[in-house]
A protein has these predicted regions:
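Transmembrane alpha-helical segments
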Residues: 101-109, 148-160, 188-196, 283-287, ...
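Membrane-embedded helix bundles of polyisoprenyl
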Residues: 3-9, 94-108, 116-200, 220-240, ...
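Membrane-interface coil-to-helix junctions
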Residues: 6-102, 124-146, 243-248, 256-274, ...
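A cross-kingdom signal targeting lumenal/periplasmic-facing segments of multi-pass membrane
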Residues: 77, 486-626, 697-701
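Extracytoplasmic/lumenal acceptor-recognition loop(s) of multi-pass membrane glycoenzymes
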Residues: 58, 414-438, 455-529, 563, ...
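Contiguous transmembrane helix-bundle modules in multi-pass membrane proteins
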Residues: 182, 296-309, 316-444, 808-846
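Active-site-proximal, structured, solvent-exposed surfaces of multi-pass membrane proteins
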Residues: 35, 615-846
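Periplasmic/ER-lumenal interhelical loops and adjacent helix-loop junctions
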Residues: 213-329, 371-378
């Protein structure tokens, strides 16, 4: 009970005054929002195994988002609480998971015959380890599997001592379903502990270990783990298929020799929230373990040391994408076990003095020599102090009975204190917890009612998006309020590659965030029209949109010229001709033509048609040199040096007759590539992230399309802090053609039938043409026209379409996530194996 209360108190204390136990961006836009969406879809469809997420990112394979808890038992419990906000539930669930992990770890250590003092202090060290509390409110998938991982360690003991497999298989299965990404490291840690327990069991039974016996017993143990993996097949197989279709995360360039050379990044490896997060005592224990008397104890220490220090394992556990210590977090319980073992041996004086002191000295010297490699001198001093204190305690306990009596507190007390200090420092430095006020605003049901009003007022197939400043947009990247609300934005580590490429390279949508994975709602009016964003929920006026209603959750704006999500047209141009179009024609063409494999018009014809609506214009940034801002024209652009962000007024041609659009594009060359650059035009922001950023966005071409109101003569340009060159600038003014006959026949969606992985409706067409959607293309689609299966093709460079003959038709679009059937079969086989094992065991018992 004391450990539970302490865990809850530590979590509440970490939030500070006026905050919630949840962070901005990742937690608020992913880890709390995706579970809400999964629950919404379950309520809407009743399907326990969904396949498609039509509502997010234009419409994508739902297994792109499985990382965020699609089948997590932690999330599934929330399905039983329909009147509770999923975000509220996830906060409570994270604290419960953390408390459960601490208690199970404590009980596991007690079952291994460690004293209550050793078990309790080690459990506290586990609680205050860098990632545990921090990630429970940030990226919860980093740690929320810990109760099941700790339970599986208990299952291994039970397997070797009682020959019972249930807890081993069940714990591994639940760990995988909770966080498949981190379960890989978890299984490796379980494997190391399994070898250790096997050897120890054989020793106690006074049995010899033979190669044949080890291989046979090892295969039987691995079979239990494999059974758990098979049980999780319904998650793992379709997720693997979805990940294979991802691009853009090709991983870091790696050198084989560097991967195989042991190394420790002290700042990331120790204390940090993105690694195991223990103190330098962990290194001392691993080194000391190499000198234990028993071979299996040496093997366990050596195995952990190799995995934790050789980058190859971190690289492998991160899916061969990069070398980051986050994949080593699952080794934390095993390190706690080794800590308890070390304290037991130290107290019973089973470690020779020289083997006790040498590792301490080695770590002290290593930390001292690494001073120049560490960014934080404060952390370096803390590490050095921590190592020196451990050294002094080890020396003192050899001569003092009193210190040996209170050895656990003497050794782990300073460690826990240092973990608390560094943890508090990390929380304060990050400063990214969501304030309670902002949280209540972001999750206010009034916004949901505004969305509902827009949806219920329109029987068509359109999108409704929520827009605000960039911070608010980041919070809402994946947020949908209604199962019939569809949005274009997305923030996920896995995504539809065609859609991502279209946004970035073909259409060139603005990139307001430093993380390339964050695909924001766009302020580009042409993109909004193309994607069928008919309604916007906003607190500010939106050019090109008419205010329809005022609500407590925001004003509802409407654009009657937005494209339907699906329609038929015979106005087409080929992909080859589209690729010849430059900016802004590569955007505006979508207001007049659909791009198909074989089109009817040329790039020259498109430019001629658009000439009456598009005009090249000057866009001259005012020259300035006042000691804070330096803006100097060059032959091909501007040289900019800003000590802080500053706003400029730039003259543009007046819109005399009606609202228009200003198109601006230029290249950016960062003179200080380790710093971010951001430039905003009329509030539309582009950002180039530091080349050192984990998810570098590569946004070196800034593209803008901003609405201009009738009579507007100037626009606001904000140049961000930094030193950079603007070059190859082009600017145009234009108007969006309101009289377009591109959308010749509109798809009438059946809202009752359209749910889950099914889109159904009718269309009436007088001419042959192409059925065009703004749903990203995927090979998993199966389409029928009047019950007859037809071949789908990619249209508009990234979206779903097919040929449609004249007449009245019933359209049915069904999505099958690749790998789902195979995954279900694998899970079924796993269930049969478990049943067969249970039956066999029962017969043997009889």
């Amino acid at each position: 009970m004391a450990l539970i209360l302490l865990t809850v108190a530590a979590c509440l204390y970490s939030t500070g005054a006026g905050n919630i136990f949840g962070a901005k961006v990742d937690w608020s836009s992913q880890h709390s929002v995706f579970p809400e969406y999964f629950r919404q879809q379950f309520y809407r469809t009743g399907q326990f195994f969904p396949e498609f997420a039509l509502n997010i990112g234009g419409g994508q394979n739902i297994y792109n988002f499985s990382y965020y808890g699609l089948f997590s038992p932690v999330v599934l419990i929330g399905y039983l609480l329909p009147n509770v906000k999923m975000s509220d539930y996830m906060m409570v669930a994270s604290i419960v998971c953390l408390a459960a992990a601490v208690i199970i770890l404590y009980r596991w250590l007690k079952s291994r015959e460690f004293t209550a003092a050793v078990s309790g202090m080690t459990a506290l060290m586990f609680l205050f380890a860098g990632p545990m509390i921090y990630q429970s409110s940030h990226q919860i998938m980093f740690v929320n599997y810990m109760p099941f991982l700790c339970l599986t360690f208990c299952g291994i003991d039970r397997y070797f001592e009682q020959k019972k497999s249930g807890l081993l298989i069940g714990g591994t299965f639940l760990m995988i379903m909770t966080s498949f990404y981190f379960s890989i490291g978890g299984i490796l840690a379980l494997g190391l502990y399994g070898i250790y327990r096997y050897a120890r069991t054989k020793e106690r039974a006074e049995e010899m270990i033979t190669v044949k016996g080890f291989l046979g017993d090892g295969l039987r143990f691995a079979g239990r783990i494999l059974t758990a993996i098979m049980l999780a097949g319904v998650l793992l197989v379709p997720t693997a298929m979805a990940l294979l279709g991802r691009s853009g995360s090709k991983g870091e360039k790696t050198d084989l020799w560097q991967l195989l050379t042991p190394q420790i990044n002290l700042e990331k490896f120790l204390y940090g929230a993105y690694g195991p997060g223990l103190s330098c005592l962990m290194l001392i224990i691993l080194l000391t373990g190499l000198f234990y008397k028993k071979a299996y104890e040496k093997i366990l220490s050596l195995g952990c040391l190799v995995v934790l220090t050789v980058p190859f394992f971190s690289y492998l556990l991160n899916g061969a994408l990069y070398v980051r210590p986050k994949s080593l977090i699952p080794f934390l319980p095993l390190m706690c076990y080794l800590t308890a073992k070390y304290l037991e041996k130290l107290k019973n004086q089973k470690i020779g003095r020289i083997w006790m002191l040498l590792p301490c000295l080695a770590v002290v010297i290593y930390i001292y020599l690494k001073k120049d490699d560490m960014k934080s001198e404060v952390l370096w001093k803390l590490l050095l102090l921590d190592a020196v204190i451990t050294l002094l305690i080890c020396v003192a306990q050899a001569y003092s009975v009193w210190i040996r009596k209170y050895l656990t507190v003497a050794v782990l007390g300073p460690v826990i204190l240092s973990l608390i200090i560094t943890g508090s420092y990390s929380w304060e430095k990050s400063g990214n917890l969501e304030s309670r006020k902002a949280y209540e605003e972001d999750t206010s049901r009034a916004i949901g009612k505004a969305v509902d009003k827009a949806i219920t007022s329109d029987g068509g197939f359109y999108r409704v998006e929520q827009v605000g400043n960039e911070e608010k947009n980041a919070e809402n990247l994946n947020r949908v309020w209604n199962s019939e609300q569809y949005i274009t934005s997305l923030y996920s580590s896995s995504y539809n590659a065609d859609y991502q490429n279209f946004r970035k390279n073909d259409f060139q949508v603005e990139q307001p965030y430093r993380n390339f994975l964050m695909q924001s709602v766009s302020q580009n009016p042409v993109f909004r029209q193309l994607m069928g964003v008919k309604y916007l929920i906003s607190s500010q006026n939106v050019p090109g949109y008419e205010k329809k209603w005022m609500t407590r959750g925001g004003d509802v704006y409407c654009n009657e010229n937005a494209a339907p999500i699906a329609y038929k047209t015979n106005q087409t141009m080929s992909e080859a001709e589209y690729d010849r179009l430059d900016f802004p024609y590569n955007q505006l063409v979508f207001t007049r033509y659909a791009v198909t494999k074989d089109g009817t018009v040329s790039a020259e014809q498109v430019k001629e048609e658009l000439a009456e609506d598009v005009e090249k214009c000057d866009f001259r940034i005012p020259e300035k040199n006042n000691g804070i801002s330096l803006v100097v024209p060059t032959e091909n652009g501007y040289q900019v040096k800003m000590k802080k962000a500053q706003e400029f007024e730039v003259a543009v041609p007046e819109q005399e007759e009606k609202d228009g659009v200003l198109f601006v594009q230029f290249r950016i060359e960062n003179k200080k590539p380790k710093k971010d650059i951001e430039i905003s035009l009329e509030g539309e922001r582009n950002k180039l992230s530091s080349i050192q950023h984990m998810y570098y966005n590569g946004n070196t071409v800034f593209t803008y399309a901003v609405g201009l109101e009738k009579g507007q003569k100037t626009v606001r340009l904000s140049l961000g802090k930094g030193e950079y060159t603007i070059k190859d600038m082009s600017a145009y003014t234009g108007v969006l053609n309101e009289g377009t006959d591109l959308y010749q026949s509109v798809f009438r969606v059946d809202k009752e039938q359209t749910k889950g992985n099914l889109i159904q409706g009718r269309i009436k067409s007088q001419k042959d043409g192409m059925f065009i959607t703004s749903i990203p293309f995927d090979k998993g689609f199966e389409m029928t026209i009047d019950g007859v299966k037809v071949k789908c093709e990619k249209v508009n460079k990234a979206f779903l379409g097919f040929h449609l003959e004249a007449g009245k038709h019933k359209i049915r679009i069904l999505y099958h996530a690749p790998g789902v059937t195979a995954g279900k079969i694998l899970t079924g086989l796993g269930v049969l194996i478990v049943i067969a094992g249970a039956v066999r065991k029962k017969k043997c018992a009889e």
